[in-house]
Amino acid sequence: MDLVSNLPARIHGILDEGAKGDASRIAFTDEHGVDWSYRRLIDAVELAAIEMSRLGIRPGDRVMIVCENSIAAIVLLYASSRLDAWAVIINARRSQHELDLIERDCRPRRVFYTHAISSDADAHACRRDADIEPFTGIGEVKVGKLDADSVAERVHRDSSRQVAVVIYTTGTTGRPKGVMLSHRSLAFVACRGKRTDTIRSDDVSLCVMPISHSYGL
Protein backbone atom coordinates (compact mmCIF):
# COMPACT_ATOMS: atom_id res chain seq x y z
CA MET A 1 0.00 0.00 0.00
CA ASP A 2 1.44 3.37 -1.05
CA LEU A 3 1.72 5.66 1.99
CA VAL A 4 1.39 9.00 0.18
CA SER A 5 -1.69 8.09 -1.87
CA ASN A 6 -3.51 6.92 1.27
CA LEU A 7 -2.83 9.95 3.43
CA PRO A 8 -5.83 11.98 4.66
CA ALA A 9 -6.41 15.08 2.54
CA ARG A 10 -6.43 17.31 5.65
CA ILE A 11 -4.75 16.82 9.01
CA HIS A 12 -8.03 16.61 10.92
CA GLY A 13 -8.58 13.41 8.96
CA ILE A 14 -5.86 11.83 11.12
CA LEU A 15 -8.39 11.88 13.96
CA ASP A 16 -10.95 10.09 11.80
CA GLU A 17 -8.34 7.43 11.02
CA GLY A 18 -7.59 7.03 14.73
CA ALA A 19 -11.27 6.62 15.52
CA LYS A 20 -11.76 3.72 13.11
CA GLY A 21 -12.63 0.51 14.88
CA ASP A 22 -12.99 2.04 18.34
CA ALA A 23 -13.70 5.76 18.71
CA SER A 24 -13.63 5.40 22.49
CA ARG A 25 -9.85 4.88 22.44
CA ILE A 26 -7.80 7.62 24.11
CA ALA A 27 -6.39 10.18 21.69
CA PHE A 28 -4.98 12.74 24.15
CA THR A 29 -4.51 13.23 27.85
CA ASP A 30 -4.80 16.96 28.47
CA GLU A 31 -2.92 19.33 30.77
CA HIS A 32 -5.30 18.50 33.63
CA GLY A 33 -4.82 14.75 33.28
CA VAL A 34 -8.21 14.28 31.61
CA ASP A 35 -8.39 11.61 28.89
CA TRP A 36 -9.94 12.59 25.57
CA SER A 37 -11.29 9.83 23.35
CA TYR A 38 -11.12 10.18 19.59
CA ARG A 39 -14.91 10.61 19.51
CA ARG A 40 -14.87 13.38 22.10
CA LEU A 41 -12.00 15.15 20.35
CA ILE A 42 -13.61 14.92 16.92
CA ASP A 43 -16.88 16.31 18.31
CA ALA A 44 -15.05 19.21 20.00
CA VAL A 45 -13.18 20.00 16.78
CA GLU A 46 -16.40 20.03 14.74
CA LEU A 47 -18.09 22.38 17.21
CA ALA A 48 -15.04 24.65 17.39
CA ALA A 49 -15.00 24.91 13.60
CA ILE A 50 -18.64 26.04 13.68
CA GLU A 51 -17.85 28.60 16.36
CA MET A 52 -14.78 29.88 14.49
CA SER A 53 -16.88 30.23 11.34
CA ARG A 54 -19.41 32.23 13.36
CA LEU A 55 -16.54 34.52 14.34
CA GLY A 56 -15.83 35.20 10.68
CA ILE A 57 -13.12 32.65 9.88
CA ARG A 58 -13.26 31.66 6.21
CA PRO A 59 -11.45 29.08 4.06
CA GLY A 60 -7.97 30.41 3.27
CA ASP A 61 -7.81 32.76 6.27
CA ARG A 62 -4.77 32.87 8.50
CA VAL A 63 -5.74 32.08 12.10
CA MET A 64 -3.16 33.00 14.72
CA ILE A 65 -3.21 30.80 17.83
CA VAL A 66 -1.17 32.21 20.73
CA CYS A 67 -0.84 29.28 23.08
CA GLU A 68 1.01 26.86 25.26
CA ASN A 69 0.48 23.12 24.92
CA SER A 70 -3.15 22.41 25.79
CA ILE A 71 -6.24 20.65 24.54
CA ALA A 72 -7.67 24.04 23.52
CA ALA A 73 -4.71 24.66 21.21
CA ILE A 74 -5.06 21.17 19.70
CA VAL A 75 -8.78 21.64 19.08
CA LEU A 76 -8.27 25.07 17.49
CA LEU A 77 -5.54 23.62 15.26
CA TYR A 78 -7.74 20.82 13.94
CA ALA A 79 -10.77 23.13 13.69
CA SER A 80 -8.71 25.42 11.46
CA SER A 81 -7.98 22.40 9.27
CA ARG A 82 -11.71 21.65 8.99
CA LEU A 83 -12.26 25.19 7.74
CA ASP A 84 -9.28 25.08 5.33
CA ALA A 85 -7.80 27.99 7.30
CA TRP A 86 -4.07 28.29 7.97
CA ALA A 87 -3.19 27.80 11.65
CA VAL A 88 -0.37 30.14 12.66
CA ILE A 89 0.72 28.59 15.96
CA ILE A 90 2.71 30.92 18.21
CA ASN A 91 4.33 30.17 21.56
CA ALA A 92 2.71 32.48 24.12
CA ARG A 93 6.10 32.95 25.76
CA ARG A 94 7.38 34.96 22.82
CA SER A 95 7.93 38.63 23.49
CA GLN A 96 5.43 41.37 22.73
CA HIS A 97 7.79 42.66 20.03
CA GLU A 98 7.96 39.25 18.33
CA LEU A 99 4.19 38.80 18.37
CA ASP A 100 3.70 42.23 16.85
CA LEU A 101 6.17 41.40 14.06
CA ILE A 102 4.46 38.07 13.36
CA GLU A 103 0.98 39.57 13.33
CA ARG A 104 2.06 42.28 10.90
CA ASP A 105 3.69 39.68 8.68
CA CYS A 106 0.88 37.10 8.45
CA ARG A 107 -2.14 39.44 8.79
CA PRO A 108 -4.43 36.93 10.53
CA ARG A 109 -8.19 37.24 10.24
CA ARG A 110 -8.35 36.80 14.01
CA VAL A 111 -6.01 35.90 16.88
CA PHE A 112 -7.04 33.26 19.42
CA TYR A 113 -5.43 33.17 22.88
CA THR A 114 -5.49 30.13 25.21
CA HIS A 115 -5.56 32.43 28.21
CA ALA A 116 -7.07 29.92 30.63
CA ILE A 117 -3.90 27.82 30.81
CA SER A 118 -1.26 30.45 30.02
CA SER A 119 -0.66 33.70 31.89
CA ASP A 120 1.56 34.82 29.00
CA ALA A 121 -1.23 34.23 26.48
CA ASP A 122 -3.58 36.13 28.76
CA ALA A 123 -1.16 39.06 28.98
CA HIS A 124 -0.95 39.25 25.18
CA ALA A 125 -4.75 39.01 24.95
CA CYS A 126 -5.25 41.81 27.47
CA ARG A 127 -2.83 44.02 25.59
CA ARG A 128 -4.92 43.49 22.46
CA ASP A 129 -8.22 43.96 24.32
CA ALA A 130 -9.39 40.50 23.20
CA ASP A 131 -12.90 39.32 24.05
CA ILE A 132 -13.79 36.11 25.88
CA GLU A 133 -15.66 33.63 23.71
CA PRO A 134 -17.14 30.32 24.96
CA PHE A 135 -16.15 27.21 23.00
CA THR A 136 -18.11 24.02 23.55
CA GLY A 137 -15.84 21.34 24.96
CA ILE A 138 -12.75 23.46 25.64
CA GLY A 139 -14.19 26.36 27.62
CA GLU A 140 -13.38 30.03 27.20
CA VAL A 141 -10.86 31.36 24.68
CA LYS A 142 -9.92 35.00 24.25
CA VAL A 143 -10.36 36.19 20.67
CA GLY A 144 -8.90 39.29 19.06
CA LYS A 145 -10.74 41.76 16.85
CA LEU A 146 -11.66 40.77 13.30
CA ASP A 147 -9.31 42.13 10.65
CA ALA A 148 -11.77 42.89 7.88
CA ASP A 149 -8.89 43.79 5.53
CA SER A 150 -7.20 40.40 5.87
CA VAL A 151 -7.30 38.70 2.45
CA ALA A 152 -7.92 34.94 2.39
CA GLU A 153 -5.47 32.71 0.52
CA ARG A 154 -6.56 30.50 -2.35
CA VAL A 155 -7.69 27.04 -1.20
CA HIS A 156 -6.18 24.02 -2.98
CA ARG A 157 -7.78 20.58 -3.02
CA ASP A 158 -4.30 19.10 -3.43
CA SER A 159 -3.01 18.47 0.10
CA SER A 160 0.58 19.06 -1.02
CA ARG A 161 -0.32 22.63 -2.00
CA GLN A 162 -2.76 23.52 0.78
CA VAL A 163 -1.04 25.05 3.82
CA ALA A 164 -2.09 23.57 7.16
CA VAL A 165 0.22 25.32 9.60
CA VAL A 166 2.64 28.23 9.62
CA ILE A 167 5.51 27.96 12.10
CA TYR A 168 7.59 31.04 12.84
CA THR A 169 11.30 30.49 13.43
CA THR A 170 13.53 32.96 15.26
CA GLY A 171 15.64 33.31 12.12
CA THR A 172 19.33 34.08 11.85
CA THR A 173 18.58 37.80 11.95
CA GLY A 174 16.41 37.56 15.07
CA ARG A 175 13.35 38.53 13.02
CA PRO A 176 10.69 35.76 12.96
CA LYS A 177 10.22 34.05 9.59
CA GLY A 178 7.18 31.99 8.65
CA VAL A 179 7.57 28.41 7.41
CA MET A 180 4.53 27.03 5.60
CA LEU A 181 3.79 23.34 6.21
CA SER A 182 1.33 21.57 3.94
CA HIS A 183 -1.32 19.08 5.00
CA ARG A 184 0.49 16.34 3.10
CA SER A 185 3.83 16.97 4.78
CA LEU A 186 2.32 16.91 8.28
CA ALA A 187 0.15 13.87 7.53
CA PHE A 188 3.15 12.03 6.08
CA VAL A 189 5.20 12.54 9.24
CA ALA A 190 2.26 11.60 11.46
CA CYS A 191 1.45 8.42 9.54
CA ARG A 192 4.98 7.24 8.75
CA GLY A 193 5.43 5.66 12.19
CA LYS A 194 2.37 3.48 11.58
CA ARG A 195 3.69 2.48 8.17
CA THR A 196 7.11 1.46 9.53
CA ASP A 197 5.68 -0.18 12.67
CA THR A 198 7.75 2.13 14.89
CA ILE A 199 4.60 3.57 16.48
CA ARG A 200 1.72 1.32 17.50
CA SER A 201 -1.87 2.09 18.48
CA ASP A 202 -1.26 1.34 22.16
CA ASP A 203 1.89 3.47 22.45
CA VAL A 204 1.88 6.64 24.57
CA SER A 205 3.91 9.68 23.48
CA LEU A 206 4.81 12.47 25.89
CA CYS A 207 4.74 15.87 24.17
CA VAL A 208 7.33 18.02 25.93
CA MET A 209 8.24 20.30 23.03
CA PRO A 210 5.83 23.18 22.34
CA ILE A 211 3.45 22.48 19.46
CA SER A 212 4.46 25.88 18.09
CA HIS A 213 7.74 24.11 17.18
CA SER A 214 7.82 21.71 14.23
CA TYR A 215 9.09 18.82 16.35
CA GLY A 216 6.39 19.24 19.00
CA LEU A 217 3.75 19.56 16.32
Task: Label the predicted regions.
Residues 78-83, 105, 213:
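Short hydrophobic alpha-helices that are characteristic scaffold elements of the AMP-binding
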Residues 8-9, 23-24, 147-168, 175, ...:
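Conserved pre-ATP/AMP-binding loop-to-beta segment of ANL
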Residues 77, 94-123, 141, 146, ...:
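Conserved ATP-dependent adenylate/AMP-binding module captured primarily in the ANL superfamily
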Residues 7, 24-57, 61-70, 74-78, ...:
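Conserved AMP-binding/adenylate-forming core of the ANL superfamily
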Residues 3-27:
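A short N-terminal helical cap/helix-turn-helix that marks the beginning
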Residues 35-39, 164-188:
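Conserved AMP-binding A3 loop
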Residues 42-47, 179-200, 205-209, 215:
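Conserved structural elements of the adenylate-forming
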Residues 116-160:
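ANL superfamily adenylate-forming
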